[in-house]
Design a protein with these regions (language model features):
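An N-terminal assembly and electron-transfer interface module characteristic of large anaerobic redox
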Residues: 1-186
Length: 186
């Protein structure tokens, strides 16, 4: 249903439905955040059109050696082998890397959710094949959510997953990173 612009009113200016929300806001995006994690390697499983921005950002950061992708082609959407594509693609990448990363940030996309892809099976299989690597489930899904965490917030939480839980020690402090530039007020 179309709503003329002059009839759009807050808080629901448009009919609720599938909406797109860019995963990158401004000049800081999920690629930049993933690169903050030392020893990590990012793997994106998506179509070439989705990878464009990721590739450009990795190139801009001169971090092409910490980034790989598995390309989803049109036939992959219909052949019923999406889980195998992800598992074998990621496995191939890890076998070919000169040095295996300690952490793999594996980014799936909206198409995996639309298809009902069994992400638990994918991660369980990869973790059993590569027990020395920590796999972090990350998402590049620009499908607007009306509730819950945004993709950006999910990634920020996911970056802490590789850290083991420690006993509380009141004589220690924790210093966490931030991508917000602190400016001198003077």
């Amino acid at each position: 249903e179309e709503i003329p612009f002059q009839d759009a009113a807050w808080p629901l200016p448009f009919v609720p439905g599938l909406e797109y929300n860019s995963p990158a806001h401004g000049t800081w995006n999920i690629v930049h955040m993933g690169m903050l994690l030392p020893g990590s390697h990012q793997i994106y499983v998506c179509g070439a059109n989705c990878n464009r921005g990721v590739i450009l950002t990795a190139s801009e950061m001169n971090a092409g050696d910490r980034f790989s992708f598995v390309e989803i082609k049109e036939e992959d959407l219909f052949n019923g082998q999406m889980e195998d594509l992800v598992i074998e693609g990621v496995s191939d990448i890890l076998h070919k890397l000169p040095k295996k990363p300690s952490v793999v940030l594996l980014f799936t996309v909206c198409v995996h959710h639309f298809m009902g892809c069994d992400l638990n099976y994918i991660y369980d299989t990869l973790r059993s094949r590569f027990p020395e690597q920590c796999f972090v489930d990350c998402y590049m899904d620009p499908i607007m959510q009306k509730e819950g965490l945004t993709p950006d917030q999910k990634l920020r939480n996911a970056l802490y997953k590789p850290l083991p839980m420690r006993e509380k020690n009141l004589k220690q402090i924790n210093i966490e990173f931030s991508n917000i530039i602190q400016r001198d007020k003077n």
